[in-house]
């Protein structure tokens, strides 16, 4: 168990470089339609199925808040939220939406947020769901570090590195423009700008074509449940469920498990999130260092640093033979940097508890 003082220390690490900046009318109606058309043309996996091989890896991205002795399973966190990528590695994969990714306005937002000289678009994704609960107590987006990036490393590891505060000199500066399209009058966005043990703030609903400029890798945050409760957990949802457009109906959407349609939505039912992310460089020297690989971390360096830090606090931790895939090791690291979860939630957006 961590002391209250150390939990407070960990909480204080998790503050973005600037508070979130609210935006309105982020995309044009034409851009929104084209972004949705890409979604309509594909079949998209659950977020949880794409990123997490086991419950320990998922829990490592959360902001704590689970009781001692809690034994998680992935099924406990199964919700009908799906993800796809519009762009990655600074490359847009769909020509019809290039203007939304190579976006000069967004680049100016990113540079201004950091007071930096340079920025480049890095990644763009969407999350989409119909009516859906939210069992997430609060989480961090996956940070990247020189040599250990979200593209080449497990999400859980990047999250723990960020929460530890031990690798700040290697942290790649990022800024996001996060935009929501949701008509739900009760579904907003909760975040903790001064750290998760301080007061929360909230982007008030409805959040249709509204957004924020943020550093989500160092900002504990959570989406909020949306839609009628009785439709939030479709019967038959599984890890192989897919989200796709209904053929011949541009505003029709399907959730399928195998060949079976388990739920249907209209566009107006959706909570549709578009996440645009840029790498930001304070000056040319930082740009060069990030690009030429001259000051990169290695996995050996990362695990050595983490293990030494944990042991220096009198916590026992084994040196694993396969640190990237050892559930017991992942749990031990997560416990060592677990500040206990957000201390408070907005009265209008309480946390949905996970049933054991």
What residue spans do the PLM features occupy?
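Catalytic core of Fe(II)/2-oxoglutarate
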Residues: 185-353
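Glycine-rich, often proline-containing surface loops adjacent to acidic residues and nearby aromatics
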Residues: 15-19, 82-93, 121, 174, ...
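Short amphipathic
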Residues: 21-27
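Catalytic core of non-heme Fe(II) oxygenases with the double-stranded beta-helix
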Residues: 111-121, 131-240
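Charged, glycine/proline-rich intrinsically disordered loops and linkers
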Residues: 50-80, 139-161, 226-261
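Cationic-aromatic interfacial patches
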Residues: 5-16, 25
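A structural signal for short, well-ordered beta-strand segments
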Residues: 124, 177-179, 274-278
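Non-heme Fe(II)-dependent double-stranded beta-helix
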Residues: 2-8, 30-113, 124-126, 133-136
């Amino acid at each position: 168990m961590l002391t209250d003082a150390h939990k407070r220390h960990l909480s204080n690490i998790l503050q973005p470089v600037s508070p979130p900046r609210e935006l309105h009318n982020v995309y044009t109606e034409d851009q929104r339609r084209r972004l949705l058309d890409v979604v309509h043309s594909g079949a998209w996996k659950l977020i949880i199925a794409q990123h997490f091989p086991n419950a320990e890896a998922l829990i490592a991205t959360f902001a704590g808040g689970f009781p001692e002795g809690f034994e998680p399973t992935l099924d406990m966190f199964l919700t009908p939220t799906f993800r796809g990528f519009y762009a990655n590695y600074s490359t847009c994969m769909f020509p019809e939406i290039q203007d939304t990714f190579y976006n000069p306005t967004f680049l100016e937002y990113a540079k201004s947020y950091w007071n930096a000289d340079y920025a480049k678009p890095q990644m763009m994704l969407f999350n989409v769901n119909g009516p859906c609960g939210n069992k997430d107590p609060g989480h961090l987006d996956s940070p990247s570090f020189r040599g250990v990036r979200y593209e080449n490393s497990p999400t859980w590891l990047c999250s723990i590195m960020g929460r530890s505060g031990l690798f700040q000199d290697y942290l790649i500066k990022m800024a996001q423009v996060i935009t929501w399209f949701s008509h739900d009058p009760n579904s907003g966005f909760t975040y903790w700008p001064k750290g998760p043990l301080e007061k929360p703030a909230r982007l008030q609903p409805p959040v249709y074509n509204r957004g924020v400029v943020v550093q989500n890798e160092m900002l504990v945050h959570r989406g909020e449940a949306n839609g009628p409760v009785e439709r939030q957990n479709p019967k038959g949802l599984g890890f192989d469920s897919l989200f796709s457009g209904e053929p011949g109906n541009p505003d029709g959407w399907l959730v399928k498990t195998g060949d079976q349609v388990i739920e249907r939505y209209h566009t107006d039912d959706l909570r549709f999130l578009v996440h645009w992310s840029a790498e930001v460089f304070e000056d040319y020297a930082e740009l060069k260092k990030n690009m030429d690989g001259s000051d990169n971390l290695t996995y050996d360096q990362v695990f050595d640093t983490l293990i030494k830090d944990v042991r220096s606090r009198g916590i026992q931790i084994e040196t694993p033979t396969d640190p990237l895939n050892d559930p017991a090791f992942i749990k031990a690291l997560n416990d060592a940097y677990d500040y206990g979860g957000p201390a408070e939630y907005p009265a209008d957006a309480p946390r949905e508890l996970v049933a054991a």
